[in-house]
């Protein structure tokens, strides 16, 4: 059983998937930093807003002005944090769209070049018929 698991785990697809997940997690952290440390503060400076502390208290006991303190006091609806995460998602989705689009364009270009370079081979029956035709034409001449 261990041997079967080892063979499964070391297949190319499983290893490729694991590498993709690790790279994806690292990419997610980069995007989080981009949104939290660059994009959202920029919008905050323009409008004087800090989205990270925007929330609606869901209980009457919540009187704090920061999200961390409000969460300690009771239930809150942290819509500012949700907005930040939604922006993260949109950026990741857009970057992935650009990557997939460029890969598809590259594949189409390579496929088109390969089709232009190598003409399709004639089927064997057509080749045999052409040989027969040529032999008949040679006998008549």
UniProtKB/Swiss-Prot annotation:
Q: Name one GO cellular component term.
A: plasma membrane
Show the SUPFAM superfamilies listed in the entry.
Gated mechanosensitive channel (SSF81330)
What sections of the protein cross the membrane? 8-28, 38-58, 80-100
GO molecular function ontology, one term from the record? mechanosensitive monoatomic ion channel activity
- Gene3D superfamilies, alphabetized: Large-conductance mechanosensitive channel, MscL, domain 1 (1.10.1200.120)
Please indicate if the UniProt record lists Transmembrane helix as a keyword: yes
Keyword match Ribosomal protein: no
Localization, per the record, is: Cell inner membrane
Alphabetical UniProt keywords: Cell inner membrane, Cell membrane, Ion channel, Ion transport, Membrane, Transmembrane, Transmembrane helix, Transport
**Superkingdom field:** Bacteria
Sequence similarity: Belongs to the MscL family.
Q: How does it assemble?
A: Homopentamer.
Q: What functional role does this protein have? A: Channel that opens in response to stretch forces in the membrane lipid bilayer. May participate in the regulation of osmotic pressure changes within the cell.
Q: Which PANTHER family match?
A: LARGE-CONDUCTANCE MECHANOSENSITIVE CHANNEL, MECHANOSENSITIVE CHANNEL MSCL
Protein name per its UniProtKB record: Large-conductance mechanosensitive channel
Starting at the broadest rank, the lineage of the source organism is:
Bacteria, Pseudomonadati, Pseudomonadota, Alphaproteobacteria, Hyphomicrobiales
Gene name for this UniProt entry = mscL
């Amino acid at each position: 059983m261990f041997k079967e698991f080892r063979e499964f785990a070391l297949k190319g697809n499983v290893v490729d998937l694991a590498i993709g997940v690790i790279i994806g997690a690292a990419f997610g952290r980069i995007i989080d930093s981009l949104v939290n440390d660059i994009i959202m503060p920029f919008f905050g400076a323009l409008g004087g807003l800090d989205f990270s502390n925007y929330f609606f208290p869901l209980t009457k006991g919540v009187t704090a002005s920061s999200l961390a303190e409000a969460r300690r006091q009771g239930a809150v609806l942290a819509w500012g944090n949700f907005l930040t995460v939604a922006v993260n998602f949109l950026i990741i989705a857009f970057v992935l769209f650009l990557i997939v689009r460029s890969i598809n364009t590259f594949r189409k270009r390579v496929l088109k070049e390969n089709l232009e370079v190598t003409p399709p081979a004639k089927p064997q029956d057509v080749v045999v018929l052409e040989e027969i035709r040529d032999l008949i034409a040679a006998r008549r001449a």
